[in-house]
């Protein structure tokens, strides 16, 4: 990433990608994304703003839980309607004064453009009509430095449309203007370096000139854009030709290809690094997601969306950028860029094998530049590449001027020089600089910063291509070559100037590196320990994206949660590069996110870069020095040889010649032995003052030489000496000596040559041995690789076999399982069929049994119908007889009434006669009259009672009866009051309390005995009355009085007090309290209750025997006893001694109840109540099991029960017949009392089933003991006649 603070786009990349349109000026998407079709309907700015509604409701879909954290209640207004804040206005606009000052100082301002002025197109179309950029604004990279060197004065409008921004929408504000500085504050230096940033754009030289000449201000901008649209992207890229866009400048649009760092192998292309500082421009023109080392640029966004870097203090490029400044790209690569060469892509995988030790992606790019050259040279070793003519023809083909051609050639040679110094292990050697063609440099390119002395490899460096012109050096191919002295001097001077200029340029680079290093160290020292940059952390996620910044607490939490591995690349905001978390923990001695002293910022590879730079410059300096030395020696050697051919040399000259030869041979030996240039370190900065000429005389002059150089050779050799002979002798001696020295020198040279050849042979042998070893190593590795592949193949086959066996076993197991499942399914199906058959058989058996039961039921029904018909016929006969009897009774009553009327008529006549007789006897005296009356009364009483006496007797009897009734009522009321008091006491103690105090309430047995005594008394009284009636012979009067008495006593429903006592006893001790025989505390199931049954039955018999003349009373008593017996049967069971059917049932059940889990008496009483034969069979089967004995028992049970019912019906009919016969034997008053008693009983019994004595009822309803319930279901006994129907007969 560029070293300067680069403006980033605000907003995610996918949003910018989706904003891409189909027009020419729209930005291209990333290569993997498809093109998007334009919408059919597009709206202008005003139309879209008119569609905005403030009161628009939130869509219902957004109200779900997942959208609630990001949901905002109020809609945001469009940005076009929101005015700029002060900070945004300050960021996006420049003041006129600062722009003018910068323009005067030559620092940009858009190359002389007015701030905010439109460039080529009008920006005054309003606040946008297209797809406006709402969020991502750019800002000049060096805003904080006060240098607006990128023409960053374009005024930003929030609603500027895509058309208004042109294809500059993703670039930073204008770059590459005339006065642009390169990171330094010094104006002249930056102006001088201007060419360096653009020299390598061989295809864009016309564009650059047009822009320099100011065409960028007018139509040139537009023309350049349209001219270069078709040639911007590589035609062989996977996505084909691309449209223009991204943040690339118009003048640099052709030169870039993307270098997706982690996707080089997937893509078929990559961006070649451009040389010199123009790489910075390239990087600025690319989106930040496709730049290398994106982690070097960290920062935040302010409220306006502008990017704020955390490294504002860094004004110098990082070492990676310095290396790029130091290494211009070679023309061959530029050519490959334009000629669509795939060589780089084909050789690109080799770079990783050679550059594993380096951490940055820089080395990978360098290797990709060097690999094609290596393969090219290996294809033709020893053959120098005639690259210069190719370049010349290429440049002529592109109509490039000579000056640009020379600049390109020098740029290439310089890059080769840097590369050979950068990679010294490749055996590069230097040759004399005279091999550089002596082309005169144009004055406009003779800047000291642009001249380099190129190294050329010797034939021994077979692994490098010879990139410079293959011109033989003087004195190497033919000794007779005579270079022109002036031309050689001129060329030598030019080369020396080039070398000095390059050294000055390197000195400037070193100064910049040193200042950057010092600045970094000063920054590291000056940052306080708790500085914000030390508290902010960034890390690279597995996708290679940089996340951050995060504070220490967040990073510590995530580290403790286990999200971070030891290999995670992290760095602080103040660090230069990322480091693995494990390395940082080792260096710091603790978890870096925990609190503690923070180490100084990590400088990255600055020291390493500085050392590398020093080694490069030292090696380059040595090479230049050796080249220069060799060139001088060759020149001197050639001149001496030429002079030797013309005239004999003096001894001094011969000595000089021998010394030159010796130096030349030594220098040749040095060069041949120097396979690796020593990395001699020197000072960081070489003085840019002084010349290389100050260094050379001491190294190149011989000690006996008086001149400073070969040009200072003595010119007075022809001067006259003292004497010619002496001079001739001296010359002969000198010639002999010189010849001897020459022979010695030749011998020495031969020895040295042989030594050199031997050494070269030895070196060649060593190289051969090394090559063989490498070949053997390679073969061994290939064999090992082959063996490993074979082993892997064997393992793979073994695994495949194992997998096949496992699959086969699994298949067999699956088949076995399927077979087992199939067998199970068949077995289950068979069992299901068998079960269905059994079910069918059972159903058939049940159907057969059902049919048999239905037949039996039909027979039973026929039998029952026959019995019912017989009973109906008997009932009809009885009804007919009864009707006849009633008719006879009515007839007899009519006769009686007629007789009574006759008697009354006779009595009236008799009374009239007596009154007449009394009136006739009024004449008698009173005494005699009374005496007569008494006598007559006595006589009458003796003879027959008179009517008045009969009436008196009747009245007296009635009065006695009423008194007796009142007395009984008083006793009854007393008993009721006592019972109520006891009940109240029991209620106070709680209704659930079982314990009851022994009260004075009479039991049912005592009440029945008392009633029986009262009935006996009443019968005796009736007998006495009947005797009196018989004595008085007034049967008719007695009958009349009995009838009158029974009518008067209708409340109690009887002629005597017996019914009233019975009714009272029912109130006192109802059927619910009859269970308490002797003690009220005893429950219903106590033993005392069991005695009630037989006693009641005996009492019933006694009552039936003793009350034969009072049928109404006895009938009522019988009903009460029957109800009690039913209760006892229901809860206690029928008396075993009385019922043979029950005894048989119990005997059979005891025999059948083998499991001893059945309560036999309860089951017998329950079965008796079940009427349906089917239910009897079901219950028998359920309780006794589905056996033949149980079925036989049920069948016999039904037969015996039917017989018993028939017998019971017959007995009841006989009893009813007897009762009816006894009823017919009584007089009409007794019959009337019986009917009245039955009616009152039916009215009083709420839970009693009303049944006529003549009709048969299947099942009679009985009362249950309410003490089992815990509460009373009847009305309170305190309230008399509650719930009973009162009739007129009751009064």
Swiss-Prot record:
GO molecular function: molecular adaptor activity; proline-rich region binding
SUPFAM superfamilies linked to this entry: GYF domain
Compositionally biased tracts (Polar residues): 371-393, 925-937, 1032-1053
GYF domain: residues covered: 534-582
SMART domains according to UniProt: GYF
Gene3D superfamilies: 3.30.1490.40
Residue numbers of Omega-N-methylarginine PTMs: 107, 119, 121, 150
Biased segments, Acidic residues type: 290-299
UniProt keyword terms in alphabetical order: Acetylation, Isopeptide bond, Methylation, Phosphoprotein, Ubl conjugation
Any one Gene Ontology BP term: feeding behavior
Biased composition (Basic and acidic residues): 152-183, 226-248, 313-364, 394-415, 846-898, 958-973
Placement of sequence motif DDX6 binding motif: 281-311
Disruption phenotype: Mice undergo normal embryonic development, but fail to feed and die within the first 2 postnatal days. Heterozygous mice survive to adulthood with no evident metabolic or growth defects. At 12-15 months of age, heterozygous mice show motor dysfunction associated with histopathologic evidence of neurodegeneration and rare intracytoplasmic Lewy body-like inclusions in spinal anterior horn motor neurons.
InterPro entries in UniProt: GRB10-interact_GYF, GYF, GYF-like_dom_sf
GO cellular component: cytoplasm; cytoplasmic stress granule; cytosol; endoplasmic reticulum; endosome; Golgi apparatus; membrane; perikaryon
Region annotated Disordered, chain positions: 112-132, 148-196, 209-248, 267-484, 732-794, 846-937, 958-998, 1011-1053, 1090-1118, 1202-1223, 1239-1263
Glycyl lysine isopeptide (Lys-Gly) (interchain with G-Cter in SUMO2) crosslink location in chain: 1129
Span list, region Required for GRB10-binding: 548-564
Sequence positions bearing Phosphothreonine: 383
Residues with the N-acetylalanine modification: 2
Modified-residue entries (Phosphoserine), positions: 19, 26, 30, 140, 161, 190, 237, 594, 995, 1276
Subunit structure: Component of the 4EHP-GYF2 complex, at least composed of EIF4E2, GIGYF2 and ZNF598. Interacts (via the 4EHP-binding motif) with EIF4E2; the interaction is direct. Interacts with ZFP36/TTP (via P-P-P-P-G repeats); the interaction is direct. Interacts with GRB10. Interacts (via DDX6 motif) with DDX6 (via RecA-like domain 2).
Reported function: Key component of the 4EHP-GYF2 complex, a multiprotein complex that acts as a repressor of translation initiation. In the 4EHP-GYF2 complex, acts as a factor that bridges EIF4E2 to ZFP36/TTP, linking translation repression with mRNA decay. Also recruits and bridges the association of the 4EHP complex with the decapping effector protein DDX6, which is required for the ZFP36/TTP-mediated down-regulation of AU-rich mRNA. May act cooperatively with GRB10 to regulate tyrosine kinase receptor signaling, including IGF1 and insulin receptors.
Name used for this protein in its record: GRB10-interacting GYF protein 2
Organism of provenance: Mus musculus
Lineage: Eukaryota, Metazoa, Chordata, Craniata, Vertebrata
Chain's gene name: Gigyf2
């Amino acid at each position: 990433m560029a070293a300067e603070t680069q403006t980033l786009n605000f907003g995610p990349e996918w949003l910018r990608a989706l904003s891409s349109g189909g027009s020419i000026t729209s930005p291209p998407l990333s290569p993997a994304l498809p093109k998007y079709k334009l919408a059919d309907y597009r709206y202008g700015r005003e139309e879209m703003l008119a569609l905005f509604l403030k009161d628009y409701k939130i869509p219902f879909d957004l109200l779900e839980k997942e959208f609630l954290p990001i949901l905002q209640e109020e809609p945001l207004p469009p940005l076009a309607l929101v005015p700029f804040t002060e900070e945004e206005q300050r960021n996006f606009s420049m003041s006129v004064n600062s722009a003018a000052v910068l323009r005067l100082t030559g620092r940009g301002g858009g190359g002389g453009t007015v701030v905010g002025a439109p460039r080529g197109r009008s920006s005054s179309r309003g606040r946008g009509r297209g797809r406006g950029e709402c969020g991502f604004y750019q800002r000049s990279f060096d805003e904080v430095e006060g240098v607006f060197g990128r023409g960053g004065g374009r005024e930003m409008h929030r609603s500027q449309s895509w058309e208004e921004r042109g294809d500059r929408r993703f670039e930073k504000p204008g770059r590459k203007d005339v006065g642009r500085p390169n990171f330094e504050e010094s104006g002249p230096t930056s102006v001088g370096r201007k060419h360096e940033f653009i020299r390598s754009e061989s295809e864009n030289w016309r564009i650059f000139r047009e822009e320099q000449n100011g065409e960028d201000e007018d139509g040139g901008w537009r023309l350049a854009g349209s001219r270069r649209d078709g040639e911007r992207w590589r035609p062989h890229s996977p996505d084909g030709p691309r449209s223009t866009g991204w943040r690339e400048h118009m003048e640099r649009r052709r030169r870039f290809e993307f270098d997706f760092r982690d996707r080089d192998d997937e893509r078929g292309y990559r961006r070649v690094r451009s040389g010199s500082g123009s790489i910075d421009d390239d990087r600025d023109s690319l989106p930040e997601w496709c730049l290398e080392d994106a982690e070097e640029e960290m920062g935040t966004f302010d409220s306006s969306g502008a990017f704020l870097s955390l490294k504002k203090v860094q004004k110098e490029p990082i070492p990676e950028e310095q290396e790029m400044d130091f290494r211009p790209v070679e023309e061959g690569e530029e050519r490959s860029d334009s000629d669509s060469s795939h060589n780089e892509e084909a050789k690109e995988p080799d770079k990783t094998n050679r550059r594993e030790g380096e951490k940055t992606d820089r080395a990978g790019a360098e290797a990709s530049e060097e690999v094609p050259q290596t393969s090219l040279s290996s294809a033709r070793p020893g053959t120098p590449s005639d690259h210069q003519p190719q370049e010349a023809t290429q440049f002529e083909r592109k109509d490039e001027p000579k000056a640009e051609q020379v600049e390109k050639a020098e740029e290439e040679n310089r890059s080769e020089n840097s590369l050979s110094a950068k990679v010294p292990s490749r055996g590069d050697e230097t040759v004399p600089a005279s091999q550089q063609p002596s082309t005169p440099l144009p004055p406009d390119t003779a800047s000291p910063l642009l001249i380099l002395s190129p190294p050329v490899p010797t034939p021994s460096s077979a692994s490098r291509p010879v990139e410079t012109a293959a011109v033989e050096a003087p004195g190497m191919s033919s000794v007779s070559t005579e270079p022109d002295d002036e031309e050689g001097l001129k060329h030598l001077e030019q080369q020396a100037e080039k070398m000095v200029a390059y050294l000055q340029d390197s000195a400037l680079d070193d100064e910049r590196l040193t200042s950057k290093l010092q600045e970094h160290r000063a920054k590291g020292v000056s940052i306080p320990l708790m500085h914000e940059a030390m508290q902010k952390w960034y890390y690279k996620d597995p996708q290679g994206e940089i996340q951050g910044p995060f504070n220490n607490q967040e990073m510590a939490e995530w580290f403790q949660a286990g999200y971070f591995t030891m290999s995670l690349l992290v760095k602080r905001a103040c660090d230069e590069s990322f480091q693995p978390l494990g390395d940082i923990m080792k260096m710091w001695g603790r978890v870096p996110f925990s609190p503690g002293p923070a180490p100084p910022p990590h400088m990255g590879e600055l020291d390493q870069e500085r050392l590398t730079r020093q080694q490069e410059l030292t090696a380059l300096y040595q090479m230049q020095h050796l080249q220069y030395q060799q060139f001088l020696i060759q020149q001197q050697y050639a001149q001496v040889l030429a002079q030797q051919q013309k005239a004999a040399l003096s001894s001094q000259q011969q000595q000089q010649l021998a010394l030159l030869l010796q130096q030349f041979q030594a220098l040749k030996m040095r060069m041949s032995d120097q396979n690796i240039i020593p990395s001699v370190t020197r000072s960081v900065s070489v003085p840019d003052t002084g010349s290389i000429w100050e260094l050379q005389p001491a190294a190149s002059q011989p000690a006996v030489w008086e001149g400073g150089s070969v040009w200072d050779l003595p010119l007075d050799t022809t001067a006259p000496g003292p004497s010619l002979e002496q001079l001739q002798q001296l010359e002969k001696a000198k010639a002999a000596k010189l010849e001897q020295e020459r022979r010695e020198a030749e011998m020495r040279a031969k020895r040295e040559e042989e030594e050199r050849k031997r050494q070269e042979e030895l070196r060649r042998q060593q190289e051969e041995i090394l090559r063989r070893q490498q070949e053997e190593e390679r073969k061994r590795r290939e064999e090992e690789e082959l063996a490993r592949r074979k082993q892997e193949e064997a393992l793979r086959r073994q695994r495949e076999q194992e997998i096949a066996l496992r699959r086969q076993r699994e298949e067999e197991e699956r088949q076995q399982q399927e077979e087992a499942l199939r067998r199970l399914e068949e077995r289950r199906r068979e069992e299901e069929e068998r079960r269905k058959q059994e079910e069918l058989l059972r159903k058939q058996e049940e159907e057969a049994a059902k049919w048999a039961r239905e037949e039996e039921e039909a027979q039973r029904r026929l039998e029952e119908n026959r019995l019912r018909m017989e009973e109906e016929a008997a009932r009809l006969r009885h009804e007919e007889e009864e009707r006849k009897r009633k008719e006879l009774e009515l007839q007899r009553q009519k006769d009686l009434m007629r007789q009574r009327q006759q008697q009354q008529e006779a009595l009236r006549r008799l009374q009239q006669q007596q009154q007449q007789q009394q009136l006739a006897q009024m004449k008698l005296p009173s005494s005699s009259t009374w005496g007569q009356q008494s006598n007559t009364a006595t006589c009458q009483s003796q003879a027959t009672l008179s009517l008045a006496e009969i009436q008196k007797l009747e009245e007296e009897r009635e009065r006695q009866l009423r008194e007796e009734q009142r007395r009984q009522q008083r006793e009854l009321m007393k008993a009721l009051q006592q019972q109520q008091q006891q009940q109240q006491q029991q209620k106070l103690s709680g209704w659930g309390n079982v314990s009851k105090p022994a009260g004075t309430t009479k039991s049912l047995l005592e009440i029945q005995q008392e009633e029986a005594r009262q009935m006996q008394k009443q019968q005796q009284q009736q007998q006495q009355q009947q005797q009196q009636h018989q004595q008085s012979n007034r049967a008719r009067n007695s009958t009349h009085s009995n009838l009158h008495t029974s009518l008067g006593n209708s409340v109690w429903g009887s002629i005597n007090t017996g019914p009233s006592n019975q009714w009272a006893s029912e109130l006192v001790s109802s059927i619910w309290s009859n269970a308490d025989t002797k003690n009220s505390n005893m429950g219903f199931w106590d033993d005392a209750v069991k005695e009630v049954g037989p006693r009641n039955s005996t009492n019933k018999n006694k009552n039936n025997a003793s009350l034969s003349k009072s049928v109404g009373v006895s009938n009522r008593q019988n009903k009460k006893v029957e109800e009690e017996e039913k209760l006892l049967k229901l809860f206690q069971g029928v008396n075993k001694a009385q019922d043979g059917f029950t005894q048989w049932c119990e005997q059979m059940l005891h025999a059948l109840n083998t499991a001893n889990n059945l309560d036999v008496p309860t089951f017998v009483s329950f079965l008796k109540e079940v009427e349906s034969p089917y239910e009897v069979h079901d219950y028998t089967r359920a309780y006794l099991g589905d056996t033949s004995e149980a079925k036989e028992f049920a069948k016999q049970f039904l037969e015996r029960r039917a017989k018993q019912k028939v017998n019971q019906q017959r007995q009841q009919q006989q009893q009813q017949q007897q009762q009816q016969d006894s009823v017919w034997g009584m007089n009409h008053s007794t019959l009337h009392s019986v009917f009245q008693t039955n009616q009152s009983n039916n009215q009083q019994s709420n839970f009693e089933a009303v049944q006529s004595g003549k009709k048969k009822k299947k099942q009679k309803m009985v009362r249950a003991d309410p003490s089992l319930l815990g509460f009373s279901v009847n009305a309170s006994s305190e309230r008399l006649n509650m719930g009973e129907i009162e009739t007129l007969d009751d009064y």
